Design a protein with these regions (language model features):
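Conserved PLP-enzyme active-site core in the AAT-like
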Residues: 1-39, 99-103, 112, 116-117, ...
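Conserved N-terminal alpha-helix of the aminotransferase class I/II PLP-enzyme fold
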Residues: 208, 253-294, 299
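Structural motif of enzymes handling amino- and sulfur-group chemistry
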Residues: 36-107, 468-499
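Gly-rich Lys/Arg/Thr-decorated short loops/hinges at beta-loop-alpha junctions or inter-strand turns
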Residues: 48-50, 74-80, 107-111, 192-193, ...
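Conserved C-terminal alpha-helix-loop-beta "cap" of PLP-dependent enzymes
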Residues: 33, 79-182, 213, 219-224, ...
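Flexible inter-domain linker/hinge segments
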Residues: 157-232, 236-244, 249-255
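Short acidic-aromatic active-site loops that bind/stabilize oxyanions
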Residues: 85, 202, 262-274, 293, ...
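Active-site nucleophile and cofactor-binding loops and adjacent substrate-binding regions
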Residues: 233, 290-298, 323-327, 407, ...
Length: 499
């Protein structure tokens, strides 16, 4: 679980809503020879086309994780998936029956893999917790005193017996060690699936290691990668995902950490997160960092939420306009709208430079309602705005903040930084500037860095008792990716990063 991700998520919608879906959709078509081909479909709502009307900023592509999940389904097929599910549910049924016999009561009326036990009056959740921790087991403890657990594919007979022993010891009861779990089901008839699933040919062909390996290789041959050549991806500089950086991801200590484990069980992760945050503060010249946003677009949204919270705290919550140069990446206006602002476009010249006269005019015209300027530095044209310090001064004179889009931060590292030029907040794309993989679209990490006055408004999390400005279900976003960036920064050092 990588201490909270990355992971893929899915949703489906009715046909009439498909043009409002975020993200890109790949569809099949025919080429001029009549052969089957695949192409980008339904991308007209993307930021580079619809800009402030785009819907794709609410999510980030997780193509790498979705591909892994897809291969899992391909390898196991419909029968394999069902067999795994039946085993998981059978273990849950066995635990329900066995623990109920010890004097507890399982209270979930319908369940697949998740159980919740009400405790007898003579047993407290703290007793259960103490025994469980002594056996290196984490359970869920509800506010009303109930205790919960979830079963999955990794739960084996040893784990089953450990769970039984915890509840038996707390109850002072003898228990019989299980040697096997019988197949069983508690799912009611009306809840059982009647429709077919995984009917496509691809889910019914590749069920041996060799077949699967060859199938993956055939797909691999159709893609361009660093194994073939450099990859042209516009102004977003990507880095080599070196083996030394990727190695930690295969270590169980990083892979198997649940995001909600007690803090004293995640001291290594917390130290890494703290150290990386300090490095990013130095690189950006800022005072605070949040690693919670899961993409650059999510970082923009989070940064704008921080600005809004700050303005509200000083009685300037009426400010609702964001000034954005015409050359800006489409995520900027899309994020501004998602965060509840309206956008004002500032002109650029033929070379992509901000038109200073138009900037001054638009800033003056909207100064009473101006919340921020969003500017990419260097711009998507590859231009370092020579007037960037003056631009920041103009915006600050209006009582507004400066949001620097860090998509092209690679060109700044070690030479200058957002804090030095006068910006108030920026996001970073760790999958661009700091070597984490892009995976054909994900997993991304888009931390935000802020000046001192904005630190109190960084995204919180309910886990820490402060959910203000929370933008992710996980407290540290895709924490499993962070060892890559930390390794890259530490191995490169100041000189290497600058060069």
């Amino acid at each position: 679980m990588f201490y909270s991700g990355p992971s893929a998520a899915y949703f489906a919608t009715r046909d009439e809503y498909k043009r409002n879906m975020p993200g890109r959709i790949i569809g099949w078509s025919k080429d001029k020879y009549g052969k089957l081909c695949y192409r980008m479909a339904l991308q007209t709502r993307e930021q580079h086309i619809k800009r402030e009307k785009a819907t794709s900023n609410i999510c980030t592509a997780q193509a790498l994780l979705a591909t892994m999940a897809g291969f899992y389904a391909v390898y196991h097929g419909p029968e394999g998936i069902r067999t795994i599910a039946e085993r998981i549910h059978s273990i849950a049924v066995f635990l329900e029956e066995s623990i109920n016999r010890l004097g507890y009561k399982q209270v979930n009326a319908q369940y697949f893999d998740t159980l919740r036990f009400a405790l007898p009056d003579t047993i407290s959740a703290q007793q259960i917790r103490t025994i469980a921790l002594s056996k290196e087991v984490n359970l869920r403890y509800f506010k009303n005193g109930d205790v919960g657990m979830s079963i999955d594919e990794t739960t084996d007979i040893t784990a089953v017996n450990v769970l039984l022993s915890i509840f038996a010891i707390a109850a002072g009861r003898d228990w019989e060690k299980a040697s096997d779990v019988p197949m069983a089901s508690s799912i009611s008839a009306e809840m059982k699936r009647q429709s077919t699933y995984l009917t496509h040919e691809v889910f019914n062909k590749y069920h041996t290691e060799t077949e699967m390996m060859r199938y993956i290789k055939r797909l691999n041959r159709k893609d361009i990668s660093l194994a073939h050549s450099m990859i042209s991806l516009g102004s977003c500089t990507m880095k080599l995902n070196a083996a030394a950086e990727m190695l930690p991801l295969s270590r169980p200590e990083f892979m198997n950490m649940h995001p909600l484990v007690p803090e004293d069980q995640a001291e290594g992760y917390r130290e890494l997160i703290s150290n990386l945050s300090e490095e990013l503060k130095i690189i950006t010249g800022f005072a605070g960092v949040s690693l919670q946003p899961n993409s650059g677009a999510a970082g923009e949204y989070a940064g704008l939420r921080v600005i809004r919270a700050y303005l509200e705290s000083i009685g300037q919550g009426h400010r609702n306009k964001i000034l954005i140069p015409a050359s800006a990446h489409g995520t900027n206006p899309a994020s501004a709208i998602q965060a509840g602002f309206t956008t004002v476009t500032c002109a650029c010249d033929a070379q992509g430079n901000v038109d200073m006269a138009d900037l001054r005019a638009k800033a003056e015209e909207n100064k009473d309602d101006l919340a921020a300027l969003m500017i990419t530095y260097p711009s998507t044209h590859g231009i370092f705005e020579t007037e960037i310090v003056e631009i920041c001064h103009i915006i600050h004179a209006c009582g507004a903040q400066v949001y620097m889009d860090g998509a092209n931060m690679n060109a700044q590292v070690g030479l200058t930084n957002p804090g030095f030029i006068g910006a108030d907040v920026c996001h970073l794309n760790l999958h661009k500037t700091f070597a984490s993989p892009h995976g054909g679209g994900g997993p991304g990490v888009g931390p935000i860095c802020v000046a001192e006055h904005l630190v109190p408004f960084l995204p919180g999390h309910k886990l820490f008792g402060n959910a203000a400005n929370q933008v992710s279900g996980a407290p540290f976003g895709s924490a499993g990716i962070l060892p890559i960036t930390y390794g890259y920064i530490r191995m490169m050092g100041t000189e290497g990063l600058t060069r």
